Swiss-Prot record:
The active site is at H263 (proton donor). NCBIfam families: lpxC. It catalyses: a UDP-3-O-[(3R)-3-hydroxyacyl]-N-acetyl-alpha-D-glucosamine + H2O = a UDP-3-O-[(3R)-3-hydroxyacyl]-alpha-D-glucosamine + acetate. It comes from the Bacteria. The lineage of its organism: Bacteria, Pseudomonadati, Pseudomonadota, Alphaproteobacteria, Rickettsiales. Transmembrane segments: none annotated. Disulfide bonds: none annotated. This is UDP-3-O-acyl-N-acetylglucosamine deacetylase.
Amino acid sequence: MQQSTLLKPVSCYGIGVHSGKRTQLTIEPAKENTGIIFIRTDISSENNYIEASYFNVSDTLLSTTISNDHKVQISTIEHLMAALWGCSIDNAIIKIDGPEVPIMDGSSKPFVFMIECAGKKLQNAPKKYLKILKDIKVVHKDCELYCTPSDHMTVDLTIDFSSKAIGRQNLSFRDQESFTKNIADARTFGFIRDVDYLKSKGLAQGASFENAIGIDEQDKILNPNGLRYEDEFVRHKLLDLFGDLYTNGTSIVSAIKGYKTSHALNNELLHRIFSDTTSYKFVTSSEL
């Protein structure tokens, strides 16, 4: 299997869910073995370049933020990263004129639509995979995430909220190609009781029912059109997981299981994997 990029550039406008700032984002084709690169076009210097890598993740509070050595950062990259993973885009340059990726409708679907509109181009280089060779586990209180060796990528994810609107939900995922149909349109969510506090901390400045599922104090869904799926919450957590894990630069070949995962836990798993060179190897499709 070959690496792929976009056939042509594609752009969108939107606001950041936390910053509330309106930005333009463009996804452009990139050469083989480039990976995913973000460029802050509002910063006119060579310091505006950030590789979308797990080791550049600088903040995981409510979203995933990447930064470079010059303290230039881009936040809320996970929904776009999930779309790139789900569409099997290995190489892309992402130009953005602000500090946060637009939230769009709160899911990955608008980014998937953009990529599909641009088209995909196969490249003259083999696609790489990260194959897990031993059991790896990360735990924080009652939250855990672990991966074990497997010949295929599988994910089993469970979430557990005290809110009756969410409760305990479980989802198993075994086919990357089904991401765009079954996972990509699952939206982010939040509780109305937290809004004032988040806004006081400079977060959720752009949040609305147009880009997030809102849950009130009586555990009712406030969005006029309700949910897209009965288990939309766990689907979105799975979306976040894929986006965060794609900061390793490849698709992971492993059986992955998670309970009450978070952006922090997702990133910690990658650090744990790459801290032990005997726990993984990079392979091509012919070596799987």
